[in-house]
Amino acid sequence: MGSCDRKALWALSFLLLLLGSSSVQGTWEAMLPVRLAEKSQAEEVAATGSRQPHADRCPPPPRTLPPGACQATRCQSDSECPRHRRCCYNGCAYACLEAVPPPPVLDWLVQPKPRWLGGNGWLLDGPEEVLQAEACSTTEDGAEPLLCPSGYECHILQPGDAAQGIPNHGRCVKQRRQAEGRVLRQKLHKEYPEGDSKYVAEPGKGQQRHFP
């Protein structure tokens, strides 16, 4: 093969190579806008995904179609609604409705502690059963006795000695119903095991009742 034929073959190969590269580049340039459009659409969906209607803040769907429900202004996400409204289903379409407040959360750190009544029974009591730092006395020595506030009774811890002028001393505990007296006595005996008996004063009275 002569040198002219070789040059012609090289020129033809180079021309085909240029045509192929330009075709590939043209195809990529033609596909680039489509790729960018798909990417931007995916980013938009990801960005608006968190603004979709929150079903947990929506009122339950009505059983009957409310008047004007189908004529209400429609929405697609909560961001299209005012502050206190959510994009919810109104029975016909999604529209901005009043948001439902979240359910209450029980904080068991501050909730009343359960009290065992025996068997399978439990009773929720107040946050504090003993009035903190509240001393009391039922001894009448010419002055008014140091009684407890309403709803509490004086649980005598130290009987005192009336002959020597020593008043009794106790703490204010919350009153119980008569049916709970046995449980209360057992609990107080565990908390204050001074001796085999306890003295509990009636509220507003000077005398004491002795529980064996």
Curated annotation (Swiss-Prot):
Cell compartment(s), UniProt:
Secreted
RNA-binding keyword on record: no
A single Gene Ontology CC annotation of this entry is: extracellular space
For this UniProt record, the keywords arranged alphabetically read as follows: Disulfide bond, Protease inhibitor, Secreted, Serine protease inhibitor, Signal
**Region labeled Disordered — which residues?**
43-62, 191-212
Keyword Secreted assigned = yes
Q: List the disulfide bonds.
A: 58-88, 70-92, 75-87, 81-96
Q: Which GO terms describe its molecular function?
A: serine-type endopeptidase inhibitor activity
Q: Which tissues and organs express this gene's product?
A: Vascular smooth muscle and prostate. Periacinar ring.
Renumbered to this chain, the signal peptide range is: 1-26
Domain (WAP): give its ranges. 51-100
Predominantly, its location class is secreted
Q: What is the annotated role of this protein in its UniProt record?
A: Has growth inhibitory activity.
Q: What is this protein called?
A: WAP four-disulfide core domain protein 1
> Which organism's genome codes for this protein?
Rattus norvegicus (Rat)
Q: Which gene encodes it?
A: Wfdc1
